[in-house]
Amino acid sequence: MKDEKPLILVTNDDGILAPGIRALISVMETIGDVVVVAPDKPQSAMGHAITINNTLFLDKISKDDDTITEYSCSGTPVDCVKLAVNEILKRKPDLCVSGINHGSNSSINVIYSGTMSAAVEAGIEGIQAIGFSLLDFDWNADFEPAKAFVKKITLETLKNKLPPGVVLNVNFPKLSEKEIKGIKVCRQAKAYYAQKFDKRQTPFGKDYYWLTGKFTNEDNGEDTDEWALENGYISVVPVQFDLTAHHTMQQLNTWKLNG
C-alpha cells in the first residue's frame, strides 16, 4: 500500500488570481494533495485581521473533476485558514503554505504581513506552516527561480517537522536561480518604517491621506534576514507566536505592582 500523500493547504494575501500563488500551487501539486483557499481580492498588509462584523462568502471556483480544489473567500488571509480548517477540509492538513508574496516580508514586515499571518494562524491550529515571499512587487514578477527552493524547504519541513508554536518565514532575493548563493537560517533584522502621510483633498474640500514611508534597517548583523537577502541568499527565519517577553519577567517582578 502506497503512503498517503500529504494534504497541503495553500493560501496568500495577494488574492487567488495572483501569479505568486499560482507558482506556489504548481510546486505543491508535485508534493501532495492540494486545497486552495485564498482571498477573492488583494488583502496585503492585513496582518492577523479577522472578519467579525460582516458576513463571509466562500465560492468554489474549481470543477469537481479538477485535480486541485480551489475556493475564493471574501475575507482576510486568516479568515481563509480558519474556514479551510474548520469548514472545508475533512482532516487537518499536514502543511499550510502561504504566498508566494509579491514583495518582502522580511524584518518588521512580518508584523504587517497577511501572508505570514495566514501561516501563523495555521501554526496556532497545530499545523506545520511556511510563508514564502519574493522581493519583487511587480505583478509580472518571475517566480521560476524560487520554485526549486520552495520545494526543497517544503519537503524538509514535512520530513523534519517544526516544533509547536513555530512557523517559517522564507524570503527570496530578486535573482536568477544561478545567482542565488544558497539558503541561510537567520534572525529577524531590527528595522522600522519612517512613516509619512501624503495629505490631499477631495473636490469637496475633505482631507484624505495616503500612507507612504521609507524602510530603514538599523541592523547590519550578518545573521539577519536583511543581510542575507542583500547578499544573495534566501532567508529562513523561524517565527514564534508566543509574544511573551520572557527575559523581562524577572525585572517586572521587582516592581512594586502589588503594594
From Swiss-Prot:
Binds 1 divalent metal cation per subunit. Its EC number is 3.1.3.5. It catalyses: a ribonucleoside 5'-phosphate + H2O = a ribonucleoside + phosphate. Keywords: Cytoplasm, Hydrolase, Metal-binding, Nucleotide-binding. NCBIfam families: PRK00346.1-4, PRK00346.2-2, surE. PANTHER family: 5'-NUCLEOTIDASE SURE, PHOSPHATASE, PUTATIVE (AFU_ORTHOLOGUE AFUA_4G01070)-RELATED. This is 5'-nucleotidase SurE. It comes from Flavobacterium johnsoniae (strain ATCC 17061 / DSM 2064 / JCM 8514 / BCRC 14874 / CCUG 350202 / NBRC 14942 / NCIMB 11054 / UW101).
